[in-house]
A protein has these predicted regions:
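A conserved hydrophobic secondary-structure block that centers on an alpha-helix together
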Residues: 136-147, 151-199
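N-terminal capping segment at the start of a domain
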Residues: 23-59, 96, 204-208, 212, ...
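Soluble metallo-hydrolase cores and metallopeptidase-like ectodomains found primarily
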Residues: 25-27, 102-105, 113-145, 212-292, ...
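Noncatalytic luminal/extracellular "stalk/propeptide" segments of secretory-pathway proteins
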Residues: 46, 50-164
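Second-shell loop/turn segments in exported
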Residues: 28-36, 50-60, 97, 118, ...
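Bacterial Sec-dependent N-terminal signal peptides
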Residues: 1-23
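Active-site-adjacent substrate-binding region
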Residues: 185, 191, 195-196, 216, ...
Length: 460
C-alpha cells in the first residue's frame, strides 16, 4: 500500500513540476514575443535621448526627464505612480573646454578634453605648465613634491585590453580619474589630466565623477579627461620633449544642492503586496551625449517590464515596482534617499534588479545573494538558455540598488555584452544612434522574464 501511495505521489509531483515548467516556457515565449514585436523601449528611448538629451542632476533637462517619466508611467495604467523628493548636487560645465600641447613657443596642437564632473575651473586665462606623466599613485608618491610642484600631472594608465570583462578593466583604471586630483594636489600640482576610460583609440574625451576628498576649496585643482588619441599623442611628445607645456582652460562651477526626484511606479501584488520586487536604472546622465546607453536603456527597459506585465495581464503575487533613480552619476543621492526611506518604514524588498550596463545584447545576470538563494536562481538558468542568456554569476549587482543590501534582499544586475560599452560611456558618443533596437528589446525581455520567475517561485 505504501509503495502504491508513494508511486502515486511521485507521479503527481512530477506532473505538477512538468506543468509548472510548461507554463514557464510558454510565458517566456509570450514575454519575448511581446518585447520583440510590440515593444516600446526603442520609441521611449528615442524621445528621452533626442527630445530631452543629456540630463545631469540639477539641470533643466533632468527635471524634464522626471516629468516625462512620470507621464509615461501614468499612461501604463499602474496602481501607483509618485515622485520621491531628493536634494542633488548641481555642477555646470560652462563653455566648452580648450587644451593644447605647446612643443615650442608658437607651435601648438589642440587636443580633445572635457572637465571631470565636480571639477573646479581654471583661472579665466587658463593654466599653462610643464607636464609630468605617471601611471599610478605609487609613481606619484615616488616623485614627490619637488618634481610635481606647479606642474600638470598626466595620469596615463590605460584600461587593460587583456581582460574579457571590460567592467573589470574599468575598475582597475578608474581610481586615477576619481582620486587623481586629490592625490596630485597634495604634492602641489597645478592641474590633472586623466586618460579617458575607453579601450578604443579615438578623439572622444570621457567625463566622469571625481572627488577632492577632504581638500579645502583653495587647495582644489582643475581636473580634465583627455581623449585616448590625445593621451597617446601627449605621451609620445613628452618622450621626445619632457619640457613641453600643456595649456588647459575650463570654466565649470559647483552650485548649491537643488531639489530633484526619483520617479516610482508599481503594480500592486495580489497575494503579498507588502513584498516588493524592484526593477530600475538611473534617470540622470552626464551632460555629454544623450545618455542613451548610460542609462536611458536601463530606464526604458524597466518601464517595459511593467508594460509587458500589464499587456499580458500577468497578475503578480508580489508588488512589482520600477524606480528611476536620480543622481547616480555624481552622488547616488537618489539611491540613498530610497534606501533610507525603505529602512525607515521597514518595507520588505524581496528582490531588486538594475540595468545600468548599456542596451547591448543580454548575456545574463549577476546576483549579490546568499549561496542558498543562488542555488535556487541557478535552477532557472535552463529557461533562459534558448534565448542565449545563460551567464549567471554570483557577485555584484548595481550602484543604485546597492544601498538596499541587508543580508536578506537578493540584488541583481543585467549583464549585457560589454565589449563596446566603454566606447560610448560618459562621452559625446553616447547617443541614440548607437542603440540597436533588437538588442535593447532583448534586454527588456530578459529582465521581464527574471522578474516573472522571482514573483512566481520566490526563493524559498
Amino acid at each position: 500500500m505504501f509503495k502504491i501511495v508513494s508511486t502515486s505521489f511521485f507521479f503527481l509531483l512530477n506532473s505538477f513540476l512538468f506543468s509548472q515548467t510548461g507554463n514557464v516556457d510558454e510565458n517566456f515565449k509570450k514575454i519575448y514575443n511581446t518585447a520583440l514585436t510590440k515593444g516600446k523601449t526603442y520609441e521611449w528611448l528615442e524621445h528621452l535621448s533626442n527630445q530631452i538629451g543629456g540630463r545631469l542632476s540639477g539641470s533643466f533637462n533632468a527635471q524634464r526627464a522626471v516629468e516625462w517619466a512620470r507621464e509615461e508611467l501614468d499612461l501604463l495604467g499602474l496602481d501607483s505612480v509618485w515622485l520621491q523628493p531628493v536634494m542633488v548636487p548641481k555642477w555646470v560645465r560652462g563653455t566648452f573646454e580648450y587644451a593644447s600641447i605647446e612643443s615650442s613657443p608658437g607651435n601648438t596642437i589642440n587636443v580633445p578634453i572635457c572637465a571631470l564632473g565636480g571639477s573646479v575651473a581654471t583661472p579665466s586665462s587658463g593654466i599653462s605648465a610643464n607636464v609630468i606623466e605617471v601611471k599610478d599613485f605609487e609613481e606619484l608618491e615616488r616623485l614627490g613634491t619637488n618634481k610635481i610642484q606647479g606642474k600638470i600631472v598626466f595620469f596615463n594608465r590605460p584600461m587593460r585590453p587583456d581582460l574579457i570583462n571590460t567592467f573589470e578593466s574599468y575598475s582597475k583604471a578608474v581610481n586615477q580619474r576619481f582620486n587623481g586630483a586629490e592625490k596630485a594636489a597634495k604634492f602641489g600640482a597645478s592641474a590633472v589630466i586623466v586618460r579617458s576610460m575607453n579601450l578604443r583609440l579615438d578623439d572622444y574625451p570621457h567625463t566622469g565623477s571625481m572627488s577632492y576628498g577632504n581638500l579645502k576649496l583653495r587647495e582644489r585643482i582643475p581636473a580634465a579627461a583627455i581623449s585616448t588619441n590625445g593621451a597617446e599623442l601627449l605621451s609620445s611628445m613628452l618622450s621626445l620633449n619632457p619640457n613641453l607645456k600643456f595649456f588647459l582652460k575650463q570654466n565649470c562651477k559647483n552650485y548649491p544642492d537643488v531639489l530633484s526626484y526619483n520617479v516610482i511606479g508599481e503594480i500592486r501584488g495580489t497575494k503579498d503586496p507588502d513584498e516588493v520586487i524592484l526593477v530600475g536604472g538611473h534617470l540622470d546622465s552626464w551632460d555629454l551625449g544623450d545618455g542613451a546607453h548610460d542609462d536611458g536603456a536601463g530606464i526604458v527597459q524597466s518601464m517595459e517590464v511593467l508594460r509587458i506585465f500589464k499587456k499580458l495581464k500577468f497578475k503578480p503575487k508580489k508588488t512589482i515596482r520600477a524606480v528611476f533613480f536620480m543622481n547616480e552619476e555624481n552622488g547616488l543621492r537618489g539611491a540613498l534617499a530610497y534606501a533610507n526611506h525603505v529602512k525607515k518604514i521597514n518595507e520588505e524588498h524581496l528582490f531588486a534588479l538594475e540595468s545600468d550596463a548599456g542596451g547591448f545584447s543580454p548575456r545574463g545576470f549577476s546576483f549579490d545573494c546568499k549561496s542558498r538563494d543562488f542555488k535556487k536562481i541557478i535552477s532557472w538558468k535552463k529557461y533562459f538558455e534558448p534565448y542565449m542568456v545563460d551567464y549567471f554569476v554570483q557577485g555584484g549587482s548595481g550602484a543604485d540598488i546597492g544601498p538596499l543590501k541587508n543580508g536578506q534582499v537578493v540584488l541583481a544586475g543585467l549583464r549585457p555584452d560589454s565589449q563596446r560599452y566603454f566606447e560610448y560611456h560618459h562621452s559625446d558618443n553616447d547617443t541614440f544612434e548607437a542603440i540597436n533596437k533588437r538588442e535593447l528589446e532583448l534586454g527588456a525581455a530578459a529582465m521581464t522574464a527574471l522578474i516573472y520567475l522571482v514573483d512566481t517561485f520566490g526563493f524559498e
